[in-house]
Amino acid sequence: MLRVDNLVVGRGAGPVVRVGQVTAAPGEAVLLVGPSGAGKTTALLALAGLAPIHSGKAWLGDIDLTALDPRGRDRLRASAMGFVFQDLHLVAGLSALDNVLLAPCAAGSAPDAPRARALLDSIGLADLAHRPAERLSRGQAQRVAIARAMLMRPRLVLADEPTASLDDQACETTLSLLLQAARDTGAALVIATHDGRLRQRGLKVVETEPMS
């Protein structure tokens, strides 16, 4: 379970945004909402140990995220977190399957090709497993990013504007796949978004509070 209690995070030396009370059980999703530039991405980076936390607390299970040293943050990020970035960071010349398999390589773990193939199958991309990422549509590439985020069976998945630039059908498909993948994996899911369409799903919503 992810728990956040009045977290104030920033970029550099100064606080940027406050996130109040957040709880997300395994398989549960929370929308972190606010206008563009309101610090949502910074809040995600702080949960990942990549942006400074100025005050407040956050726990993943019984691990106090605010008490970890840099090495501990790196280990936890590699072993227990998955990410779906707005810029998907797929390697254009690699296949969909090989892009999914980058996750364990980055974490220093052995690749799990059978699980990667099963994930691609579960999101409807089994037939495109060997297609280069540069030949995938935006929606297909987004699915590959979701599969990559789930490969290591993370306890926490952080998604930054996962439906940006998608039409209504692709938005619905992407969100449904992301929610289902989190449930199947048992991962708490935090989605930073200013896409009003996501609110229609009745998910838990937390507003960010800009500090400036």
Regions found by a protein language model. Give the residues of each.
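Helix-to-loop junction immediately C-terminal to a conserved catalytic motif
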Residues: 48
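Conserved ABC ATPase "signature" region
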Residues: 64, 111-128
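ABC ATPase NBD coupling module
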Residues: 65-82
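Conserved catalytic motifs of ABC-family nucleotide-binding domains
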Residues: 153
